[in-house]
């Protein structure tokens, strides 16, 4: 999930940039004054949401403010609260917004729901308890939160490892589909072995990770949850193919121990219909996408 996750980080950084611009607005800049979406009060309100100012947000809502307003990228206050959440730092803000009627199913211009932006297990749990779809998919490539959470966990980056590993386990426990496939792959260097490919399942992305100890653990979790170990993407590559192509011998050995085969090996052992395990890319959109 290298490309998809990097794109997500870029998108999150861009969204946070809106609030840096907001600082200039509060200092007297007329940012958003001419916006067809937001007025001065609304822009300031989103700033309070991002900063976790419960008192200011409550005051705005008590005065009749729109809890589901959307800014230019289509983000709602709930999107902003989750996007600003660092290890639960905006959990109380998320709870407040949900209690006041925030739409947990709202999508921005890329069809990210608030859940897609979650990086903290408890925050994601609160969203799911409020009715968020654990398998909600983005517009471009059909990514779910499980894709990015599992990939992040497989990178083994200090505290983030435990954070995303716990998030991955929780999502699976809450019904995340471990076999959903990407509709499209990377927009750049699409032929590079480390890039996402159409038809990838979460296991493909995890198998590419350079942190092989952590990747093997995440692979084990996905497999135990029902991930099809020999699932193929549109190029006929299984997760084992991806591990080998990216020179991940430890991950490859682990996958072999679980019965993994390469796409070529699978084809040779499936004389009846070698195409039967080729992926069917789910093309169904989120309900809001068809409106």
Label for each model-derived stretch:
Residues 41, 74, 111, 141-142, ...:
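Start-of-repeat signature of ankyrin repeats
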